[in-house]
Amino acid sequence: MTSRKPLGRYRRIVIKIGSALLVDRKAGLKKAWLDAMCADISGLKAKGIDVLVVSSGAIALGRSVLDLPSGALKLEESQAAAAVGQIALARAWSESLSRGEIVAGQILLTLGDTEERRRYLNARATINQLLKIGAVPIINENDTVATSEIRYGDNDRLAARVATMTGADLLVLLSDIDGLYTAPPHLDPNATFLETISEITPEIEAMAGGAASELSRGGMRTKIDAGKIATTSGCAMIIASGKTDSPLSAIENGARSSWFAPSGTPVTARKTWIAGQLQPAGGLHVDDGAVTALGAGKSLLPAGVRSISGLFSRGDTVAIIGPAGREIARGLVSYDAEDARRIAGRKSAEIEAILGYPGRAAMVHRDDMVMTAQIGSKSERQKKDAAHA
């Protein structure tokens, strides 16, 4: 397992900041906290580290400015609050970072900007250019146009997508909790704190609880989801409390936090994009033999597919699901859903006779696939990743 190292030894760090850290429901923006955070960022920049910030708080800040009532907001109220809050939030970051002679650049993303390949590449190029000129990208979901059907829904997973998009080697999720426990600590006083998580297993996933604040849409569940996206792409992750001033300095000085080890070596940019897809277009349900073959680094053949779910087109990202019902991989499918159903369970040599044209032998080729669950030993997986990168 890759060992934990000080923040100063990472090359590129994505920092996600929760709404409750930045905004007080009554008092508004926590300016002193933001100034201390920006001083921490300035310290990292002075060491030559690229820093990106995924900042929640637009809706919460706009809500405070507009004096909207507590409780759930209607969609149009959330979008209006975001429109007001985004201006105030960007100005606050710009002013605070400027004290360290750092330029901030605002980027508002929608789900399509990371899920559609061409837009993904455009967004990545813009972010990389900002980093190249020494700026700090301040990234948030564009809540003024996002709807419940087309949104990330939380900035934890958005931050993980940004980390994989930009090739970051560390993702730091700052929240109102100091890390992962075996059970929600506010419900179970006997919950045990986990300092190091070598891999995200079903047992780890089961430990996740819900959101703790009306100002936040995320919770431990979304942080674990973010961890799966980030660590699969070779990016370590830290969950830490941001309640203290200068939380990054606190982490460096030994404050309690949970560290998630990257699950392997970083894969190619194409595979990174595949691994981080938030909404697969469908699913391929496979048998035990296929699971073993995929674990050995082989392609998914039609013979190992038991059933098909969803409607998808050739080239879409699909989830590959094992007999236990758990996703084990993601990949770009070689057939649309209708043809995939027709050849599922059949030998590759039969494809032309069934479909009337000579298709690809693999339902999902190994070069278009990323494992998202642990199969086999970690050393074996790392060798395969390196061989196919």
Curated annotation (Swiss-Prot):
The keyword RNA-binding does not apply. GO terms for molecular function: ATP binding; glutamate 5-kinase activity; RNA binding. Gene3D superfamilies: Acetylglutamate kinase-like, PUA domain. It catalyses: L-glutamate + ATP = L-glutamyl 5-phosphate + ADP. SUPFAM superfamilies: Carbamate kinase-like (SSF53633), PUA domain-like (SSF88697). Its main location: cytoplasm. Catalyzes the transfer of a phosphate group to glutamate to form L-glutamate 5-phosphate. GO terms for biological process: L-proline biosynthetic process. GO terms for cellular component: cytosol. Pfam families: AA_kinase, PUA. This is Glutamate 5-kinase. Residues 281-358 form the PUA domain. CDD domains: AAK_G5K_ProB (cd04242), PUA_G5K (cd21157).
